[in-house]
Structures are given as C-alpha cells and as structure tokens.
From Swiss-Prot:
The gene is kefB. Keywords: Antiport, Cell inner membrane, Cell membrane, Ion transport, Membrane, Potassium, Potassium transport, Transmembrane, Transmembrane helix, Transport. Belongs to the monovalent cation:proton antiporter 2 (CPA2) transporter (TC 2.A.37) family. KefB subfamily. Pore-forming subunit of a potassium efflux system that confers protection against electrophiles. Catalyzes K(+)/H(+) antiport. This is Glutathione-regulated potassium-efflux system protein KefB.
C-alpha cells in the first residue's frame, strides 16, 4: 500500500471508529460490535473504500500483540505456574473436544477428513482480542471464571505452533528428510530470547529511565514489543506469544506500571483497527449465496463451544452463575482461524468455497458474542436481582436505601461493613457474580450489573437514596458514573475513591469534593505510628498527622493540572516550608503543655 493510500486508509479507519463506536455504545451493543460494523461499512462489500483487506488485517494483529504484552506485565512467573492446571488441563480439553466434534460435523458436510481436521482446530480457537476486551468490560478479569478464560486463551496461543506444523503433514507435502538442524536452531534462539530477556531487560530499562526523557522510554517500550513480535514471527511462532513472554519477564520489574502506561494508547487504537479489519473481511457474496449453510454453521459453532466450555467450567468447579459468562465470552471463532485456513488453502486442502464459508462463519460468530453477552447479562440481572422464594429476608426495613455503594472489592467491603454495622440502609452494586452471591447469602440487598446503566441505578433506589459511594477499580468507570449521577440524580451526595492525585484532580474538576485516596490515609496512619516509635508523644504525632493531612489537601486543590510545572513546583516548595514552620511551632507549644493521651490502637 502506497504512502498516500495508507494515509487515506488511516483517515477512513479513524472516521469509521469515531462514527460507529459512540453509536454502538448509545444502542447498548458495545464497542467491539461497533468496530465490526464499521469495518463492514467501509470494506469491499460495503462502500468499497478499502479493498486490500489482507495486508491491513496482518498489520492490525499488532493490537493483539500489544494486548498480550500488557497481560504479561500483570502476570509474574510464579502466578503463571499457579495457572498450569487450568492452562494445560481445561485449555487442552477445550481445544481437543471442540475440534473433534467440529471436525466430525465438517466431514458430514462433505469436507475431506484432512480439511475437516484443520477446520475443526481453527474453529475451536477463540478470539483473544475480543474475549479479553469483553472480560475487561464485564469485570470478569478479577473473577475465577475470568482467570480460567485467560488460561484457555493462553493455551490456544500455545497451540498455534503444533497446529501450523500439522497442516503440511495432512497435505502430504512434508519433506522426506526432516531438517532437525533448523528445528534445533529455532529452539536455541527461543532459549536465548528467554535468558537474554531475563537478565538484560531490567538493566537496559534502568539505563533508559536514567535519561529522564519520557519519549525515549516510550520508544524503547515500542521497540521491545515490536522486536519480540518480529523475532517470534521469524521463528514461525506466534507474535502474541512472544510479546506475552516479554511482558512476563518484566512483570516483577520496577518499570511495570510505566511500561503499561506507555503501551496502553497504542493497544486501544490497534485493537480497534483489528476489529474493523475483521469486519472488512466479511464476504457478503458468500453469505448471500450460502445463507442457510452459514446461518446454521454459526449457530452450531456457538452452541457446541458453549456446551463444551460450560461442561468444563462445571467440572473445574466454577460457580453456576459464572459458567454462562465463561462459556459465552469464548464461544466465537478467533483471529487464528484466518492464519490457519490461509495456510491450509496454500496447501490445497480446501475445495471450492470451503475456506470462504469457514471464514464467514468465524467472522459472524465474532459478531454474535457481544449480543450474546448482553443477553446473558440481562438474564443474570433478572435472576440475581429479582426476588426469589428461598432468599433470606434482608435486615433492611424498606426498599429505599440511604446509601448506594458501587463496588464490593477490598475498598468497598470496608465501607459497606462500616455502614451496615451502624444500621444504615445500603444497596450494593457489583459486577462480580461471586461477590453478589456471597452478599445475598448473608441477606444483604445487592444488585448484579453495570452501575453505569441508568436503569440499574433506578432499580437500586438511586432516586430515593441520599448518597452514593463509588469504589470502582477503573478511574474511567468512576468518572462516567459521576457524570451519570450528576445528570440523572443531582440530589445524590457523591463520595468517591481516587487511586492517586491524578484521579483526585479529575474528581475535583468534576465537582466532587468528598473523596479518599486509597493509600493516603493508611500511609498517614503508619507515618504517625513511626513518629511514636521514634519517641514523639502520641498526642503530638496525631496533631502532626492532622496538620499534614490538611496542608496536603490544600495543595491538592491548588496544584490543579492547568498550572504549569514551574508553578506547581514553586507552590509545592512553599507548602513544604509552611508545613515545617507549623511543626516547629507545634513542638514548642507541646513542651509547654501537659501530656495529652497515650498511644492507642
């Protein structure tokens, strides 16, 4: 693709995303389906703006590559070892069972047995990009079902290597003299990558970080990700697997969060490009001429994979309320099918339109997943939020809560327990089904679902409540919920959790004055105890803590992001001098006073 054509394509992609995704969000069908529909619209079977789909699809796989790098950063080697049972147990069982059943059905549909085996393996794979995106949107990444889903996806990425090696064997085109030397060199190169990454990456990033130039750090991160992807591709392995390993090697480094922040914007854009490319690849001509065959194959594919995944989730011990989410989020075909089927086609395993039919089936199955997840969410919401005959009667006296608590993680649990201990009427909103089930067992009123949905807030009693406490893990969810409450429930007193100073500034700018930084209070308390351990009187240490809190909050309100760096630095130095003067006066006053109270727990 020429430079001018590439620029035009980039503009079209951005326009399609900007136009389609907000519309999809407004319709409640999710961003992923919006990207897919945008791809259909601008692709060769839509308005025809772009015709070179294969090249763009290959480039857009970088979105999956960046996503796997970030996932690797969140998993250290010890955590990965803990998942070995689910990766090689449940993951292997899912691929083998699904592939066997689907291959049998393809043979009944007049596929050669060799083509049926390749087709069954390809259809058994799920979309890593789509599944992980949906799991994050639904809050599944913290749940047991989300961890199991990730394990299955990781095994599927590992299965890419033997699956591609199987194609020439099935086609009968393998060389009589197997090149063991070439295989040994690939294994050696892979080992060098692991050992070199283990001992060289951290010193290299330490050297780069010492320069103090953020752009260089971002460039080094991009260089690492793209180099790992190209290296694995040259070895004939999965690019996503290479960047995942690079992420795992850096998971315990001090640069983990900075690496994640540097990559995140590129990951989001390239993932969007990937989904648009998948939509562009949908062959509407084949769909039109084989409509019944394709429709039946999509339904059969989704049903078989859901049944297999549901059965494995049950055997693994996943809660019944989480099994449907787990089964549906992995029910689609995946991006690996495009690679495997193209390789098989080059070996002449498929006849006629067989490859096109399989690719259309995979693409349409990917489009069904967001709709399927939305339907299951509604079903779970009715099941969990509706009254049941066997439910214990909650201790709340009526259906009008005083406080709505959003989120029942570690932060939200402490708040909810304190409120309940003081007989406050509360309603908890939570996206984690396991937490919902636990709360309902104890008789507390709890709603399952996404708190950023207005109807859920209404059914939870937002119109009658006095306050809402927002403890979301994601800052984006917090700000979205703040805007929603200010628009639809302006009477609510909003209290929120802030992860740090940046989120605190965003809350202040949105008009939220009551918030708590999650580590600030505990750090102050530990600092107070440290002062006492160094010989300071408990009463004096408490006053020092209060002065520090008051001055820090004043600095937080004054040092808003609109000010330049020099203004912020100047005010920070001034505040530090003021704090030292206050402490000096306090120490002189304490010497003239009698002792106050002693240390307490």
């Amino acid at each position: 693709m020429e430079g001018a054509d590439l620029l035009t394509a980039g503009v079209l992609f951005l326009f399609a995303a900007v136009a389609a995704v907000p519309l999809a969000a407004r319709l409640g069908i999710g961003a992923v389906l919006g990207y897919l529909l945008a791809g259909i619209a601008i692709g060769p079977w839509g308005l025809g703006f772009i015709s070179d789909v294969d090249e763009i699809l290959h480039f857009s796989e970088l979105g999956v590559v960046f996503l796997m790098f970030i996932i690797g950063l969140e998993l250290n080697p010890s955590r990965l070892w803990q998942l070995r049972r689910s990766i090689f147990g449940v993951g292997a069982a899912q691929v083998l069972l699904s592939a066997a059943v689907l291959a049998g059905l393809l043979m009944l549909a007049d596929f050669l047995w060799q083509a049926a085996v390749v087709g069954g393996i390809g259809l058994a794979m799920s979309s890593t990009a789509m599944a992980l995106q949906l799991m994050r949107e639904k809050g599944m990444n913290r749940s047991e079902s989300g961890q199991l889903g990730f394990s299955v996806l990781l095994f599927q990425d590992l299965a890419v290597i033997p699956a591609l090696a199987l194609v020439p064997l099935l086609a009968g085109s393998v060389d009589e003299h197997f090149d063991w030397f070439k295989v040994a060199m690939k294994v050696l190169a892979f080992a060098v990558m692991l050992i070199g990454g283990r001992y060289l990456l951290r010193p290299v990033f330490r050297f780069i970080a010492a320069s103090g130039v953020r752009e260089v750090f971002t460039a080094a991160t991009l260089l690492l990700v793209l180099s790992a992807a190209l290296f694995m591709d040259a070895l004939g392995l999965s690019m996503a697997l290479g960047t995942f390993i690079a992420g795992v090697l850096l998971a315990e480094s001090e640069y983990r969060h900075e690496l994640e922040n540097a990559i995140d914007p590129f990951k989001g854009l390239l993932l969007g490009l990937f989904f648009i490319s998948v939509g562009m690849s949908l062959n509407l001509g084949v769909l039109y001429t084989h409509l019944l065959w394709v429709a039946a194959s999509v339904v059969i594919l989704v049903v078989i994979k859901m049944l297999t995944l549901y059965l494995l989730a049950r055997l693994y011990g996943i809660r019944s309320s989480e099994r449907m989410q787990f089964a549906s989020v992995l029910s689609q075909g995946g991006e690996f099918a495009f690679v495997l089927f193209s390789t098989a086609s080059s070996q002449r395993l498929f006849q006629g339109d067989q490859m096109a039919l399989l690719l259309v089936t995979v693409t349409l199955s990917m489009m069904t997943t967001p709709l399927l997840m939305k339907g299951i969410d509604k079903w779970l919401s009715r099941r969990l939020n509706g009254p049941e005959e066997n439910d214990e009667k909650p201790w709340v006296e009526d259906d009008k809560p005083q406080v709505i608590v959003v989120g029942f993680g570690r932060f939200g649990q402490v708040i909810a327990r304190l409120l309940m201990a003081n007989k406050m009427r509360i309603t908890v909103l939570e996206r984690d089904i396991g937490a919902v089930n636990l709360m309902r067992k104890y008789g507390y009123k709890v709603y399952y679902g996404d708190a950023t949905q207005v109807e859920l807030l209404r059914s939870a009693g937002a119109e009658a409540a006095e306050s809402i406490v927002i403890t979301c893990n994601e800052p984006e969810d917090t700000m979205k919920l703040v805007a929603l409450c200010q628009q639809h429930f302006p009477h609510l007193h909003i209290l929120a959790r802030a992860r740090g100073r940046v989120e605190a500034h965003e809350l202040l700018q949105a008009g939220v004055t009551q918030f708590s930084r999650e580590t600030f209070s505990s750090a102050l308390e530990l600092g107070r105890k440290t002062l006492v351990s160094l010989g300071m009187h408990p009463h004096q240490a408490q006053r020092a803590q209060l002065h520090f809190r008051r001055l820090d909050m004043r600095m937080l309100r004054e040092l808003i992001p609109e000010h330049s760096d020099m203004v912020q630095i100047s005010r920070a130095r001034e505040a530090r001098r003021e704090l030292e003067e206050i402490f000096q006066r306090e120490m002189q006053q304490e010497r003239r006073q009698l002792d106050g109270w002693d240390e307490f727990e």
